[in-house]
């Protein structure tokens, strides 16, 4: 199974000049956690809800997010894959790099999709028990770290 089978194809993107506050409002409204930052169809970086939370502050029951441009706070050069990348490789990279979203680029380096941890969980949930999963899955017991 390839990234093209798991990715979200209708991806909301923003320009690097978009403010972090606007990006945050878009994420809240659309119930998403990641926004690829593009210019001319080319991926420049990715901004997440975590960026808004790190740079914002809590005021009462709300989060006040600054008017800084996302180009200043985005993660530039994110890990990416192509539509033919095996899902197991996407999962492995996302786990090893502790990321929750991976942009999918075509041969022309244009954004064609986004694989998120939610997409992968939905893929896992939709997998029939009669079909093997496209990646290894096992439960490991929790071990307490040694006392220091």
For each predicted feature, which ranges?
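A glycine-centered beta-loop-beta connector
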Residues: 27-30, 35-51, 94, 102-119
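The conserved cystathionine-beta-synthase
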Residues: 13-31, 38-39, 80-98, 105, ...
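Tandem CBS (Bateman) regulatory domains
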Residues: 1-10, 48-80, 86-97, 111, ...
């Amino acid at each position: 199974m390839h990234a093209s089978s798991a990715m979200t194809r209708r991806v909301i993107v923003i320009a690097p000049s978009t403010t972090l506050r606007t990006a945050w409002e878009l994420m809240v409204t659309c119930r998403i956690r990641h926004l690829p930052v593009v210019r001319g169809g080319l991926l420049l970086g990715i901004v997440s809800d975590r960026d808004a939370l790190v740079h914002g502050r809590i005021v009462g029951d709300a989060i006040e997010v600054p008017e800084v441009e996302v180009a200043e706070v985005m993660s530039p050069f994110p890990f990416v894959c192509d539509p033919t990348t095996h899902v197991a490789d996407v999962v492995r990279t996302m786990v090893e790099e502790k990321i929750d979203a991976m942009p999918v680029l075509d041969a022309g380096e244009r954004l064609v999709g986004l694989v998120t941890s939610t997409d992968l969980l939905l893929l896992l949930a939709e997998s029939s028990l009669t079909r093997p999963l496209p990646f290894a899955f096992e439960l490991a017991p929790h071990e307490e770290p040694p006392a220091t």
